Amino acid sequence: MLKIKNLHAVVDGKEILKGINMEVKAGEVHAIMGPNGAGKSTLSAVLTGRDKFEVTEGEVEFNGKNLLELPAEDRAREGIFLSFQYPVEIPGVSTVNFLKTAVNEIRKYRGQPPYPAGDFLKMIRQKMELVGIDSKLLNRSLNEGFSGGEKKRNEIFQMAVLEPKLAILDETDSGLDIDALRTVANGVNKLKTPENATIVITHYQRLLDYIVPDVVHVLYDGRIVKTAGKELVAELEKHGYDWIKEEVRGV
């Protein structure tokens, strides 16, 4: 599904990504962990097409297409979804209208007609029930006045409605209490299918207690320096990142 080869990226003239290699297959959950400043959020920004970052070398292929040639909006239409660390507020635009526009943009891109109003509302209700979101949030302006937990739940609801092929959760556990964390994780787990994939970017273990990864990568100084199974999460929780840094410096 996603193939990253020797990816280098700079921001404001400083190289942040220094040769990322990674492959994500359909049906898999990958966790990317690492200390602050390692390049985790830069990687998610590059994959989703943020203008701030310049790719200087490497390739990114998504379902056979050159992802780096696509503008950000077409990457979303192709099925890439980003859950932000700090979701933005959009005053005056209700959640339900935002989602209707987004869904119909994707359908138009794929040569499909707009969703009939009745079918759309039926689908919305099914997704609300699936991820356990309060119906009151639908008619409120997108994220405006939402608590941190409500914003994150709303993003998982958006993910349920948009049905992305690849979901990137960038520090989605930031600022969540344990109940909100569990709710978000349960929603993500319910949306997992053999046809889609998820990348979970996090600094801490606790989210990965609920979303169990198939593959764990450690990102350090702009490179993936270690890849293993879920057992690596417990090792990092026990020993921190210092042993990884020492291992890298010793090479």
Regions found by a protein language model. Give the residues of each.
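Walker B catalytic motif
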Residues: 168-172, 179
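Conserved structural motif at the start of ABC-family nucleotide-binding domains
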Residues: 2-4, 17-19
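ABC ATPase NBD Q-loop/coupling interface
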Residues: 59-75, 143
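Q-loop/switch helix immediately C-terminal to the Walker
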Residues: 82-86, 92-108, 120-123
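ABC ATPase C-loop
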Residues: 159-160
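The feature captures the beta-strand-to-loop junction immediately N-terminal to the Walker
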Residues: 33-35
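Conserved beta-strand-loop-alpha-helix hinge in the C-terminal portion
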Residues: 219, 223-245
